[in-house]
Amino acid sequence: MKFIILSTILGLAGASATALTAVPIIEKIAPKSKSCPSGNTDCRTAKQAAPFLINAFKDHDIYDPKMMAAVLALMAFESVDFQYKRNQVPGRPGQGTANMQMANYNLLYAKDIPELAPKFEGVDSVEGMSDDDLNKLLDAVTVDKYNFASGAWFLATQCKQDVKDAFKKDVDEGFKLYIEECVGTEVEPRQEVFNVAKEAFGI
């Protein structure tokens, strides 16, 4: 079943039912997510991640298959198919989530989550934070329900409207703008995963 069908039923079915549909497609985009290496406590399988990903798309009103594909492709690339939620190289404190966000975005993200916001009241910048505090911030946003919502949150709140509009005109141009102008990195190594995601979505 294509994700284009999944996007249609997102608003009609419960998250658990929709997640069952999503699992094989997430596994296509992130093939290593079929299982987790023994001893890797950060890793989550597609089956574990699916309900949180589905809820995130619904919560952030992302129903366009092109944008859903882009978010999943980026998260799969950055987290090595959901095996990691903390930056591994060079091991930067505070950088992580399945979206592998820098610490400044994780602070913004935490302050956008009602359950976490009180913990970071009055904290307006990560500058000057100790490594321990940066990692405590990361710990807060890498609980599964927040970890797997990070990609949808980032696209919905941190990307300009012209980036979102670009997906409607040309999916590859939209992805290019998303990666280069919004995420601020190179599109080329991520394009291969996005090509797989497009196939999964039937785009």
Language model regions located:
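Peptidoglycan-targeting cell-wall enzymes and recognition modules
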Residues: 19-52, 57, 66-160
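Hydrophobic alpha-helical segments
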Residues: 154-161, 181-185, 200
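A short secondary-structure junction signal
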Residues: 85-87, 163-165, 190-193
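Acidic helix/loop microenvironments that form the catalytic cleft of cell-wall polysaccharide enzymes
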Residues: 75-79, 163-188
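Fungal secretory targeting signals
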Residues: 1-22, 202-203
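C-terminal helix/juxtamembrane-tail motif
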Residues: 189-203
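Short amphipathic alpha-helical surface patches that serve as generic macromolecular interface elements
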Residues: 145-152, 172-176, 191
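Contiguous, function-dense segments enriched for cysteine-driven chemistry
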Residues: 63
